[in-house]
Amino acid sequence: MGLFDRKEKYIRINPNRYVRNGVDHHVPEVPDDLFAKCPGCKQAIYQKDLGQAKICPNCSYAFRISAKERLDLTVDEGSFQELFTGIKTENPLNFPGYMEKLAATKEKTGLDEAVVTGVATIKGQKTALAIMDSNFIMASMGTVVGEKITKLFEYAILEKLPVVIFTASGGARMQEGIMSLMQMAKISAAVKRHSNAGLLYLTVLTDPTTGGVTASFAMQGDIILAEPQTLIGFAGRRVIENTVRETLPDDFQKAEFLQEHGFVDAIVKRTELADTIATLLSFHGGVQ
């Protein structure tokens, strides 16, 4: 060892093992996802205590769930038939890093895009169905999301089916610029054609539903349901406060606030949504 060589200051230890009475013991690692912090009550919740519906046992906060989890909770087992899976996302503006971000998100989520579309039965009631997944780039609305939802309405018109959409989105996808914003008008036109055919359109607003999705098809349903405490809005709270220079109510942009002011028809617990949707579909000439 040289005179000026750096010496180790500390003893290296392995936190996953220890020796007691001359016997080497291994300490099991605690999985990173064993507990979840509830955004509602701020408590650490054992994941298994959340149950399939991902509801906090302390405050009943509904955790955000994936499209796959939503399907399992909502539709009849084995009834879902996915549609419009072959549409590929492109990069119309050559936005730097966009395709790489898409590839990484697809690998992480197992989804091709931010919305899953298809046909299913809910308690025996047949419907066209779309579920947005906030795990995919915050379920932002790009050209593929717009195309899939538009095609779903067109399919529903041909098959004379109602449409149920579970919305969740951070808004328009900025990487696609004006092409993303165009989807608002495109889907809205499809909603109108579906309505002209005398068919039911039901939306379920889930946390969060914001931006261009709120400003278009999320609020165009014949019946608008929402999960409790869902964040619903267009611009962000701070943007609005800075613009109007007023302090907004604590419950501003929450589902309960919107129901009180007539923008939401009913707030339904996640565990009761399937029954509620099926009942509404049956009232409006449901298809078996």
UniProtKB/Swiss-Prot annotation:
Keywords: ATP-binding, Cytoplasm, Fatty acid biosynthesis, Fatty acid metabolism, Lipid biosynthesis, Lipid metabolism, Metal-binding, Nucleotide-binding, Transferase, Zinc, Zinc-finger. It catalyses: N(6)-carboxybiotinyl-L-lysyl-[protein] + acetyl-CoA = N(6)-biotinyl-L-lysyl-[protein] + malonyl-CoA. Binds 1 zinc ion per subunit. It is an enzyme of class 2 (transferase). One of its GO terms (molecular function) is ATP binding. GO terms for biological process: fatty acid biosynthetic process; malonyl-CoA biosynthetic process. SUPFAM superfamilies: ClpP/crotonase. Its cofactor is Zn(2+). Pathway: Lipid metabolism; malonyl-CoA biosynthesis; malonyl-CoA from acetyl-CoA: step 1/1. Its EC number is 2.1.3.15. It is found in: Cytoplasm. NCBIfam families: accD. Acetyl-CoA carboxylase is a heterohexamer composed of biotin carboxyl carrier protein (AccB), biotin carboxylase (AccC) and two subunits each of ACCase subunit alpha (AccA) and ACCase subunit beta (AccD). This is Acetyl-coenzyme A carboxylase carboxyl transferase subunit beta. The lineage of its organism: Bacteria, Bacillati, Bacillota, Bacilli, Lactobacillales.
